[in-house]
């Protein structure tokens, strides 16, 4: 069995060589790349296996089995598509050749199955007669193997189920099934007749061979020089001889066999004629079946056309219904247009009335603008005066602090002056007592309480006492006492002059403190000089300079920071004023657009603003106390206006929502609701735009 299959596959390879292919195709390995098979398919059915399809098959693959597998899979897939589309046959996947085995191992069994499929394509293509004649011109052994391969393919076809498009009606499906069964039975009969014809051809060839053999035997016996089996010459044939009798018997037997062969031949001729008639009848039936299949295809096309017409009819019906709905909506729109025309006429009348009112109020616009400008100027003046008052208050507070410091220093100086006077009086008293009892002088003469003197006075008194003692011890007498008294008097006069100058400077500083700030430091230094009486001026001056420089640097930094903060605050105030003015203008516009009655409210508001503007001069006199109160009434008025505008806007939105709910009621269709006009805006908006 395997040998027969191998012979069939070799015969198919030899048949493939008759197609004049350019690619090598002599062995299984040469065919395993798929290039020759693709060229054969392109030559057999160029309308399906086109040149573009052939270009996808790679020819130079070498030993790359992956490219071979890719080529073979493309070929097998194309063959299956050809059988399905062109021949209306669905081949099972079990019969699919294994491309991997062909490419990797060169399996002849799988390659033979692929060649069988290619042979089926050649026998059933448009030029099938050409390929059938090529097969008939081959050798008898090749013809037998190719016929056997065709029989296997026919068995495969009989097992395959044809792929047909589904037919809706039951009658047409039954006709198609019966026609397919008739076609299968006729194909089976044709196959059987072909097998019988092949058998008769083989018998004819065998008979011809036997006739040749018999003719050779007759020629040998007719030879007179024929030698028998025993080596003796049989001699010429004569009547009555044994040789003649043997030959006569042989001739009679051969005649009988010839008659039998002729009768068998006549029987076979009769059978062949009958089979030819049957073949003709079957061919006629096949033609009728082809015509019936064509009619069925036409019927299917008509059914498809009717389906499309039915779908179009449904679409037209739906469109007709939509058009009816649109017509109803159009009628509704006509009614709505009439209502809108009536409303527009009313609106025109109202617009005329509003225009007349606008002409009346046009004269008041100039006054309103003037009042606005005046109000803005007054606001600017008010801001400037407020800034001045703030600065004046700041300077006033600073001056009060400085004045309090100076007063405290003055009080301390006055108290020190009083103490010095008391000390001077006590010294005078002590000197008078010393003059009365000089011999009794000593520490007991100093009966004054030291608690009544300051530290400096005590030190001076002690120093003066020591000097008095020294003078009394050194010189003695009234002369030393008189000199000391004169010195003390001179010092007292100097101290009094210094006190007078210090008091005068304090008064001058209190009067001109705002103009000259540097005199304070000088006064403090002089006061310290008078109080300390020559204490270490250099060290005190250095320390004072360091502290003043440090304080000045701190003050400069604080001033710079305050100036920067002041600039930022000014910018913020300007931006707030701009936003404030914008909000006021927007509130006025909203009130004007909301209702016609807002015009009178705006006029009242302007009157209130003007009245408040006239009162600004009165409030400017009391800037320090009521600077912020001038702006408070206007802010309250504007807040009230913004609140009224907000409530009116809420009423309008509520009205629009109610109109939308009424328009989208259940009594109207969807399209009618979509075509409803939007809720009208208030008429005063149009007036405001004009």
UniProtKB/Swiss-Prot annotation:
GO biological process entries: cytoplasmic microtubule organization; cytoskeleton-dependent intracellular transport; endocytosis
Location of the Calponin-homology (CH) domain: 6-122
Location of this chain's protein in the cell: Cytoplasm, Cytoskeleton; Endosome
GO molecular function: dynein light intermediate chain binding; microtubule binding
Source species: Anopheles gambiae
Keywords in alphabetical order: Coiled coil, Cytoplasm, Cytoskeleton, Endocytosis, Endosome, Microtubule
UniProt entry tagged with the keyword Methyltransferase: no
Family designation: Belongs to the hook family.
Originating gene: hook
Domain notes: The coiled coil domain mediates homodimerization.
Protein name: Protein hook
GO cellular component: centrosome; cytoplasm; endosome; microtubule
Any Pfam family matching the protein: HOOK_N
Subunit record text: Homodimer. Interacts with microtubules via its N-terminus.
Coiled-coil regions, chain positions: 134-515, 546-577
């Amino acid at each position: 069995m395997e040998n027969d299959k191998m012979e069939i596959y070799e015969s198919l390879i030899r048949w493939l060589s008759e197609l004049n292919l350019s690619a090598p195709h002599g062995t299984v390995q040469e065919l395993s790349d798929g290039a020759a098979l693709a060229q054969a398919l392109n030559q057999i059915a160029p309308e399906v296996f086109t040149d573009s399809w052939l270009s996808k098959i790679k020819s130079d693959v070498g030993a790359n089995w992956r490219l071979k597998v890719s080529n073979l899979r493309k070929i097998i897939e194309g063959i299956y598509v050809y059988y399905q589309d062109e021949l209306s046959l669905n081949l099972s996947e079990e019969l699919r050749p294994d491309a991997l085995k062909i490419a990797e191992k060169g399996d002849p069994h799988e390659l033979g199955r692929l060649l069988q499929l290619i042979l089926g394509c050649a026998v059933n293509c448009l030029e099938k007669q050409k390929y059938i004649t090529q097969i008939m011109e081959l050798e008898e052994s090749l013809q037998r193997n190719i016929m056997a391969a065709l029989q296997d393919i026919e068995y495969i076809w009989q097992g395959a189920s044809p792929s047909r498009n589904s037919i809706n009606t039951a009658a047409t499906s039954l006709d198609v099934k019966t026609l397919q069964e008739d076609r299968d039975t006729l194909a089976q009969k044709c196959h059987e007749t072909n097998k019988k014809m092949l058998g008769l051809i083989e018998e004819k060839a065998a008979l011809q061979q036997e006739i040749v053999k018999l003719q050779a035997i007759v020629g040998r016996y007719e030879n007179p020089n024929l030698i028998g089996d025993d080596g003796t010459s049989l001699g010429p044939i004569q009547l009555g001889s044994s040789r003649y009798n043997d030959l006569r018997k042989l001739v009679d037997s051969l005649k009988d066999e010839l008659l039998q062969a002729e009768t068998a031949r006549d029987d076979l001729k009769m059978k062949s004629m009958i089979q030819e008639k049957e073949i003709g009848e079957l061919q006629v039936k096949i033609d009728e079946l082809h015509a019936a299949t064509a009619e069925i295809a036409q019927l299917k096309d008509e059914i498809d056309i009717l389906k499309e017409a039915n779908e179009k009819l449904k679409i037209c019906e739906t469109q007709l219904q939509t058009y009816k709905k649109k017509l109803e909506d159009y009628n509704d729109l006509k009614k709505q247009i009439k209502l809108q025309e009536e409303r527009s006429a009313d609106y025109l009348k109202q617009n005329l009335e509003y225009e007349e009112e606008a002409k009346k109020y046009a004269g008041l616009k100039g006054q309103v603008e003037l009042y606005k400008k005046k109000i803005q100027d007054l606001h600017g003046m008010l801001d400037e005066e407020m800034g001045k008052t703030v600065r004046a208050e700041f300077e006033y507070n600073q001056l009060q602090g400085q004045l309090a410091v100076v007063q405290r220093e003055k009080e301390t100086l006055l108290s020190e002056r009083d103490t010095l006077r008391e000390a001077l009086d006590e010294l005078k008293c002590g000197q008078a007592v010393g003059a009365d009892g000089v011999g009794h002088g000593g520490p007991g003469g100093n009966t004054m309480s030291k608690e009544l003197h300051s530290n400096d006075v005590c030190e001076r008194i002690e120093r003066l006492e020591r000097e008095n003692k020294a003078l009394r011890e050194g010189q003695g007498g009234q002369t030393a006492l008189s000199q000391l008294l004169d010195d003390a008097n001179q010092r007292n006069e100097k101290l009094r002059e210094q006190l007078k100058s210090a008091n005068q400077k304090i008064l001058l500083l209190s009067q001109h403190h705002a103009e000259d700030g540097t005199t304070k430091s000088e006064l403090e230094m002089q006061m310290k000089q008078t109080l300390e009486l020559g204490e270490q001026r250099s060290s005190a001056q250095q320390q004072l300079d360091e502290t003043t420089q440090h304080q000045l640097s701190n003050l400069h930094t604080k001033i710079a920071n305050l100036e920067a903060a002041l600039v930022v605050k000014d910018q913020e105030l300007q931006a707030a004023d701009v936003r404030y003015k914008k909000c006021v203008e927007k509130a006025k516009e909203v009130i004007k657009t909301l209702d016609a009655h807002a015009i009178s409210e705006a006029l009242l508001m302007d009157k209130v603003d003007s009245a408040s503007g006239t009162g600004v001069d009165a409030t400017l006199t009391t800037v320090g106390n009521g600077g912020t109160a001038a702006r408070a009434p206007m802010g309250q008025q504007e807040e009230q206006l913004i609140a009224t505008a907000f409530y009116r806007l809420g009423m309008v939105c509520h009205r629009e929502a109610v109109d939308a709910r009424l328009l989208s009621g259940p009594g109207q269709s969807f399209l009618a609701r979509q075509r409803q006009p939007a809720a009208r805006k208030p008429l005063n908006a149009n007036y405001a735009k004009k």
